[in-house]
């Protein structure tokens, strides 16, 4: 397991984002991150109900990373890259109430379900 500081570039959907990852020694890379262990509804679909839930998940992720976050960064824990070339990771942030894992919070709030690969 590797741990990095990262800053948000852009939120793609409820379980995917682009970020600038600090590798140390003033070396940074811009990568797409897929939140590991969870799956959110798709926000780019013709199914209007799924799209509505997908946009709600994206909004929840936005609030956590941009609104609740007291630092300008989050902590990325990652051990691998997925089959589509995205970094698979768990995100942690610090808020006024304490620290928490974004992946777990999305599941707890009903915006995501646990997912560990395979058929959805």
Could you describe each region identified by the protein language model?
Residues 1-120:
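Small beta-barrel nucleic-acid-binding modules, primarily SNase/OB-fold domains
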């Amino acid at each position: 397991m590797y741990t990095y500081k990262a800053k948000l570039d852009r939120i793609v959907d409820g379980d995917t984002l682009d970020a600038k990852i600090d590798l140390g020694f003033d070396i940074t890379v811009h990568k797409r991150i897929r939140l590991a262990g969870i799956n959110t509804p798709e926000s780019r679909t013709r199914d209007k109900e799924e799209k509505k839930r997908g946009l709600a998940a994206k909004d929840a992720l936005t609030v956590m990373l941009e609104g609740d976050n007291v630092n300008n960064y989050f902590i990325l824990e990652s051990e691998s890259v997925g089959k589509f070339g995205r970094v698979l990771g768990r995100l942690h942030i610090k808020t006024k109430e304490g620290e928490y894992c974004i992946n777990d919070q999305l599941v707890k709030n009903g915006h995501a379900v646990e997912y560990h690969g395979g058929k959805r």
